[in-house]
């Protein structure tokens, strides 16, 4: 056992003395040491309840003959960090999470790890750490929030955080009063858990099942459901079996597992952020995978779900309809069914054991919402290295669009123009210098897209950015444009009025300029000057790579 480095031999007497100070006895030193990586915090609704999850994990570890040690890492609530300086820190927190877990696990010689994430950057940060450390590991997330209930005119409707973001645009346009907004604000987030739609956090928690790193139910069992606590106890027990069998993350997260994750992703219509995060996990796992492969998967994999923001259903509905297992059951012809999982069974075996889909929340593969998956990576002279769009959330009339560019060099300037009524039907908003280096931190453009949707412009206006989008975004929103403006990508050459062509069906994103004209303009673009010159974001700017490779740090 790795923990023998701190337990065995006379030279480890000081180590044992310190461990005895924790309450351990001689018998404890014969057992595996398990690190419990908790991301509990009192400021994030998705993490406020994770102490209860951790206690259940400890019970499982103890019952199976191990010793659990809980430690914490950071967690950012993207909703609270949205639309101010805090959003610059959200994506960069992913690397901090991975690094802090690495430090704790290596410093204390754990034999295995149980990860307890829930929200957006915590899941991929922990997955990256698991691959980097490559010791037996298992994930159990905190679970999704229930949808809120809004009563209006004797009618009750299901609402969520995205409802509030879009309502701001409705208020700005005079379609909703501030009093009505307040009533919505009060009920949209009714308790603990990750925000209730197929937004980034829930996308990543669901994909963790498809990657093979979590037990069935991880992605969909609500945070307040007793089955979540039972799942946590089972995860604590299962880590002991993984240690016994010496099954490590890199045995599980292979190119086949990445294939399965993206297959599930496009079937669910998951967040575009998943592309960034799964590519980063693949990098840490040494699993070679390209953006072009995502398009090949999406071309042949049906879109089976219309979950918020793409449709009316929430994660609780997905859970009631069979959960991720039922989606995987429909996807079996497109999966790598022999891929291993932490359960000890293959992904195909788990799919076989799942209940049949209901053909409502989870459509049959023979009756999909679309024969093609929910994500697409667009290429062209505007995005030579790719740009990601959630096509399942794009209105049919915007799948192909041609319009004049409206250029903004920050989210704030674009937001001001939208609120001021300066964006017209047919326009293509371009928000640049918001990429990994340019932002820095690749902020989410949820406020601009929510305003457009709330104003009813999401079927008439497209938005292109080298920044990111929230999983709650809907509309013709192309993000992750690579190379970014700060790296002198073609997006930096655009000027107001340039005609932009979007063809999602054929994976194309281009501007009606010759290569010569683009290069001529780029030659006159000033050298990018970093916006932040101190602290962690200075380090981040100097070391982060392109969104096309997951915005990981330089090797």
Curated annotation (Swiss-Prot):
Binds 1 [2Fe-2S] cluster per subunit. This cluster acts as a Lewis acid cofactor. Mg(2+) binds at residues 78, 120-121, 444. It catalyses: (2R)-2,3-dihydroxy-3-methylbutanoate = 3-methyl-2-oxobutanoate + H2O; (2R,3R)-2,3-dihydroxy-3-methylpentanoate = (S)-3-methyl-2-oxopentanoate + H2O. Its EC number is 4.2.1.9. GO terms for cellular component: cytosol. Its cofactor is [2Fe-2S] cluster; Mg(2+). The active site is at 470 (proton acceptor). GO terms for biological process: isoleucine biosynthetic process; L-valine biosynthetic process. One of its GO terms (molecular function) is magnesium ion binding. Gene3D superfamilies: IlvD/EDD C-terminal domain-like. Pathway: Amino-acid biosynthesis; L-isoleucine biosynthesis; L-isoleucine from 2-oxobutanoate: step 3/4; Amino-acid biosynthesis; L-valine biosynthesis; L-valine from pyruvate: step 3/4. The modification N6-carboxylysine is found at residue 121. Belongs to the IlvD/Edd family. Homodimer. Functions in the biosynthesis of branched-chain amino acids. Catalyzes the dehydration of (2R,3R)-2,3-dihydroxy-3-methylpentanoate (2,3-dihydroxy-3-methylvalerate) into 2-oxo-3-methylpentanoate (2-oxo-3-methylvalerate) and of (2R)-2,3-dihydroxy-3-methylbutanoate (2,3-dihydroxyisovalerate) into 2-oxo-3-methylbutanoate (2-oxoisovalerate), the penultimate precursor to L-isoleucine and L-valine, respectively. This is Dihydroxy-acid dehydratase. It comes from Dehalococcoides mccartyi (strain CBDB1).
